[in-house]
């Protein structure tokens, strides 16, 4: 009888010990599991915040890249390039191209520091950029003191391209009458520009991969450049082709300059003005 009671007490104590150990083990494992889950949740939340922050930074970088792309290329061309990865070169039957440069720029550069020249070009072309936004034109490029603008490309605008370019040219020449060099210049430099304009066909397309540029090619570009280089300071020099287009509008005053040799050929050229500006003489 005593042996049975002793065995029963032993069994009960063993059962109780097992239950206590199981309870403690369960508590420890549950606590460990909760701690692990909590740490894992914290890591996931932290990772999610990192991803969110990186996504935000990526979005900002994407917008900056798009902004830079739209500054380098016409908007419709940049959009097509972004969507398809390539843009086919196009032929344009008639566009108008403007070239301008600073008269005696080389001489001015010889008596100025490089920083002064950079200040001058940044200041001057910043003003030009503000003015071209008023017209249906596209700034193709600036190389040194040369400034190139086109109208009728890449967006067609009928026969209005010549008028837009001529109005811009008049606006720029009027701007130069009031222009003062930046404060970095110790002496007052008189800055004049000469402008050359020509109308005709051209081919336009994207050139380059790392730094893509929208470039124009053809004799029209070359002739417009010659119009500028054979022009006079403070005047707007345009070819007879452009003259024929703006003559139809009846709003411009032109003066025949005569026959000028342009790229080994003869071309009739005129200077231009309108009723809002002082008449220009040839």
Where are these regions (language model features)?
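Cytosolic regulatory/linker segments at or just downstream of nucleotide-handling modules
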Residues: 202-203, 230-282
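Catalytic core of nucleotidyl cyclases, primarily class III adenylyl/guanylyl cyclases
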Residues: 100, 131-164, 178-221, 245-247
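Beta-sheet entry/capping signal
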Residues: 97, 138, 192-194, 234-236, ...
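Hydrophobic transmembrane alpha-helices
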Residues: 1-16
């Amino acid at each position: 009888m005593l042996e049975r009671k002793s065995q029963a007490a032993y069994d009960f104590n063993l059962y109780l010990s097992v239950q206590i150990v199981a309870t403690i083990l369960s508590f420890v494992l549950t606590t460990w599991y909760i701690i692990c889950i909590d740490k894992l949740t914290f890591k996931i939340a932290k990772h999610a915040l990192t991803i969110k922050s990186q996504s935000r930074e990526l979005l900002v970088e994407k917008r900056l890249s798009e902004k830079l792309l739209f500054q380098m290329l016409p908007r419709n061309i940049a959009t097509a390039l972004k969507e398809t990865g390539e843009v086919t070169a196009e032929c344009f039957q008639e566009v108008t191209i403007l070239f301008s440069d600073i008269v005696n720029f080389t001489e001015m550069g010889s008596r100025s520091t490089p920083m002064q020249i950079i200040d001058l070009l940044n200041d001057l072309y910043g003003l030009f950029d503000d003015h071209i936004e008023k017209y249906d034109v596209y700034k193709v490029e600036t190389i040194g003191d040369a400034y190139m603008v086109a109208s009728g490309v890449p967006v067609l605008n009928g026969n209005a391209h010549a008028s837009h370019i001529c109005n811009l040219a008049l606006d720029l020449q009027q701007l130069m009458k009031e222009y003062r060099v930046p404060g970095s210049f110790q002496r007052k430099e008189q800055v004049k520009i000469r402008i050359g304009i020509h109308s005709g066909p051209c081919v336009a397309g994207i050139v380059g991969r790392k730094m893509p540029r929208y470039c124009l090619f053809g004799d029209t570009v070359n002739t417009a450049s010659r119009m500028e280089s054979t022009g006079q300071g403070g005047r707007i020099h345009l070819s007879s082709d452009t003259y024929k287009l703006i003559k139809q509008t009846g709003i411009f005053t032109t003066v025949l300059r005569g026959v000028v040799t342009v790229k080994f050929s003869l071309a009739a050229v005129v200077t231009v003005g309108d009723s809002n500006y002082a008449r220009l003489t040839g």
